[in-house]
Amino acid sequence: MQDKYLPSAVEQAAQQHWKAIDAYKVSEHAVGPDGKEKSKFYACSMLPYPSGKLHMGHVRNYTINDVMARYLRMNGRNVLMPMGWDAFGMPAENAALNNGVAPAAWTYDNIAYMKKQMQSMGLAIDWSREVATCSPEYYRWNQWLFLKMLEKGIAYRKTGTVNWDPVDQTVLANEQVIDGRGWRSGAVVEKREIPMYYLRITDYAQELLGDLEGLGWPERVKIMQQNWIGRSEGVRFAFPHEIKGADGKLINDGKLYVFTTRADTIMGVTFCAVAAEHPLATHAAESNPALAAFIEECKHGSVMEADMATMEKKGMPTGLKVTHPLTGEQVDVWVGNYVLMTYGDGAVMGVPAHDERDFAFALKYNLPIKQVIDVKGQAYSTDAWLEWYGDKEHGLCIHSGKYDGLGYKAAVDAIAADLAAKGLGEKKVTWRLRDWGISRQRYWGTPIPLIHCDSCGVVPVPEKDLPVVLPEDLVPDGTGNPLAKDPRFLECTCPSCGKPARRETDTMDTFIDSCWYYMRYTCPDAGTMVDARNDYWMPMDQYIGGIEHAILHLLYARFWTKVMRDMGLVKFDEPFTNLLTQGMVLNETFYREDASGKKTWYNPADVDVQTDERGRPAGATAKADGQPVVIGGIEKMSKSKNNGIDPQALIDQYGADTARLFVMFAAPPEQQLEWSGSGVEGASRFLRRVWNYGYANAQAIRDGAGTAPTADDAALRREIHTVLKQANYDYERIQYNTVVSATMKMLNALEDAKTASPAGRREGFSVLLRVLYPVVPHIAHGLWQELGYAAETVDILDAAWPQVDEAALVRSEIELVLQVNGKVRGSLTVPADADRAAIEATAAASEIVAKFAAGAAPKKIVVVPGRLVNVVL
C-alpha cells in the first residue's frame, strides 16, 4: 500500500478494475443475492450538447446523479444511469462556418473527448446504452413518429413567420438577430411567411396543465409551466363591419374577432388594433402608402413574444372602422406592432382606461380614454396609470348602461350572454400555449421525411424508406440551407407516381431529439421505437438538470410522451416522476473597461486578489502586467465572462475524487455553488487524511477481521453509528453536502479513538468508506481493496450499505452539567439509568461541590433529567 495518496494512480487502478468487470452494465429484472428481483430505479441527467469540453455545471450535474446511483445500488436497487448526446443544433453549424469543417466531424470529435472526460470522472454510466441524436438509427424514429402524427392530424402544415436575412438568403434563429440585423451580414432582418410544420400541443393543453399536480417537481418549475401553458377564461367576440375586399366580398365575413379576459370593460373600447399581417391591415395599406411603409417596418421586428412585451409600442390608423357589438358605435381600427398574427385572431380590443398597455398607447396617440370600472374611494385620472385601474376584484361597472353596478363575474356573464344572443360571441377558454412549430431552415438536424412532387403535392416518405439520412459531409457557408444545394439529397423519386421529385429541406427543431432520448436509453438496440424494456424502466424515477430547461424541454417531452401513449407505444402519462434542478456554479469575475465601454474579462486564475484585514477583497491586479482590474462580483460561470474553471485541469491537478467531493460539499444540490480554490484544497486535504488513516492503521484493520469490537470501542461505535443515522437521512433527502459533513465527523472520531481495538477500527473505517464511496468512489475502492475488506465481503460496488446498530447508540453513562448555586462549575458523569436519588448522591459527593460547600450540607439539589444538576448551598 502506498504511504501517500496519489490520486492519479488510485483513480486509474479503480477505473481499470470497473472496466474489466463491466461494472455498470445493467439489465432488466436483475435479482439480488437472495434470489428476489430488485426494484428498479432510473436516474438520469439531461443529456449534454457536445460543445467540446465539460464545464463545472456538467461536473456538478453528473456527480449528483452518480452519487444517487451508487448509493441506491448499494441499497439493493437495480439502477440505470445512462448517457448520450444532444448532437444536432446550430452551434455545430456555427463551428463549421468558423472552421471550415463539417458539423458531423466537429460533433463526433467533441463526443469522443467529452466521453473520455466523463470516464475520467469515474461516473457509473452504462455506456452500452449510449445514444447520439445525430445517429440515423435514432432520428429515424423522430421521422417515423412525425409521419404517424401526420396521419392522425397531430402534425400539420401552415404558414409561419420567420426572421429572413435578405443578404445571406437564410432564415435566422431569434438569437441570431441583433438589434434588428443579421448577426453575420448586418442586413436589416425581414419577417417572412413560409410554409412550416406544426404539432398540435394545444390539444393536450388541459392535460399538460392538470397532470403537473401529481409530479414530484420543484414548485417553481410547476409554476413556470403553468404560466407558459397559460389557461385563460374569457369571451371571444366580433366587431361587425361592412369592409369589402377587391373581390367585393366582406373581409373575414364582416367580423373582426378578438378575445378578452376582461369582457366587463367592453363598454370602454375606444379602438381596436390588428397585426401588420391582418387582412384588414393589408386591405387598408393598398390605398395608404404611409400605412404600407409602417406595415413593412413591423415586418422587420422580432417574432418573439418576449421581445414584443418590452419593445416600444407603435401604431398607425388604418382609416377603417368597425361597429361596437353592444353600443353600435363606430370604433377606429389601428395597426399595432405589438399585435401578433399568430396569437388568437391577430386583433385586440383597446380599453385604455383599464389596460396599462392600451393606456400608454392612447396617451401616445391621443386616443379617447373612457372609464367604465370604478373602485370605491378611488379617483380616476388620465395623468398616470394606477394599479387599481386594472382591478377586477373590487371594481364595479359604471358608464356601462344596463351593466352598471355589476362586479367582474356578473358583468362578464351578462355581457357574454348578450353577445351570444346576437350571434357575435361566446365564452371561451384560451391558452397562452401555441402549437409547436418544428420546421427549421437549417442543415444539422433531423430531415423532415416528406417529398414534394409537382403532380402529387406533398407526399410522406414510405416507412420502408426510413430513415431519410442526412448527408454528413456538407459544410455550411452561411448562404442558405446546404441541403437545398445538394442534388444527392434533394433529388428523388415520388413514391406515389414515380416522377422526379424533391425532398423537403427543412429539418426538425432539435427539441424533438430531446423529447424521448431517455426512452431510447432503455432499449437502444430495439428494432422499434421502444420495446418492453421501456415499460420496465419508465417512467423515470429521478431526472436531474438545470432550471433553464424548466419550460420548453420538459413541456415538449411531456407532450411527446402523451402522444406516444395515445398511439399505444407507452403505458404511462408522465415521463419524469421526480425532478431535481441543480443550482448554478458561480465564480468571481474580473474585467477592464476601455474608453468605448468595451469590457475585457480576465479569468480568476490570471488575477491576484488583495484582501483587507478581514480577508475581504480590496483590489485585484492582472498577473500578466500587475495592473489593476475591476472586481465584477460573483456570477454564473460562462465563456462570456471568462470565469470558468476547466474541470480537466482540476482533475489533472487534484484528481476526480477531489473535484467530486468539492462540488458535493460546497452547497446543497439545488442551491447555487460558489467556487472556492481554498475549498478545493480543503477537499484534497480531507482525502489525504482518509488515506493516511487507512495507511497508518492498515495492520490493525487487517488484524480486526473476524473479531468483534470490545467495550473500549463503545464511544467510537456510538459516534460512528449516530453520524451514520444522520447520513442515511441526508442521502434519502438528496442533501449530499451534509453527507460529506458526516464523513468528516466519522474520520474525526476514528482519529480521536486512540485506544480503539483493531475490530473497532475495522468496523468504523468500513462504515466511513461505504458512506464516502458514492461521493468519492476511487479512493474508497482503493482502500477497500488494500485493507482486505473485499476479501471478506465483496467489491465495494455491491457491498451492503451499513446498517445503524441501535444498540451502539445507547449510552452506558451520561454527562450532566454541574451547577453550584446556579453557576456552572463543571460536569458530572453518572450511569445512564441512574435514578434521581443516585444522581443527587453523586452530586453531593463530588469534589467540585465539596470545594464550594466547605463542609456545609446542601440545602437543596435540583435535577433536570438528562441535562443538569444544581446544588444549592
Curated annotation (Swiss-Prot):
It catalyses: tRNA(Leu) + L-leucine + ATP = L-leucyl-tRNA(Leu) + AMP + diphosphate. Its EC number is 6.1.1.4. A motif ('KMSKS' region) lies at residues 636-640. A motif ('HIGH' region) lies at residues 48-58. GO terms for molecular function: aminoacyl-tRNA deacylase activity; ATP binding; leucine-tRNA ligase activity. It is found in: Cytoplasm. It is an enzyme of class 6 (ligase). Gene3D superfamilies: 2.20.28.290, 3.10.20.590, HUPs (3.40.50.620), Isoleucyl-tRNA Synthetase, Domain 1 (1.10.730.10), Valyl/Leucyl/Isoleucyl-tRNA synthetase, editing domain (3.90.740.10). Its main location: cytoplasm. Keywords: Aminoacyl-tRNA synthetase, ATP-binding, Cytoplasm, Ligase, Nucleotide-binding, Protein biosynthesis. Pfam families: Anticodon_1 (PF08264), tRNA-synt_1 (PF00133), tRNA-synt_1_2 (PF13603). GO terms for cellular component: cytosol. GO terms for biological process: leucyl-tRNA aminoacylation. InterPro entries: aa-tRNA-synth_I_CS, aa-tRNA-synth_Ia, Leu-tRNA-ligase, Leu_tRNA-synth_edit, M/V/L/I-tRNA-synth_anticd-bd, Rossmann-like_a/b/a_fold, tRNAsynth_Ia_anticodon-bd, Val/Leu/Ile-tRNA-synth_edit. ATP binds at residue 639. NCBIfam families: leuS_bact (TIGR00396). Belongs to the class-I aminoacyl-tRNA synthetase family. This is Leucine--tRNA ligase. The gene is leuS.
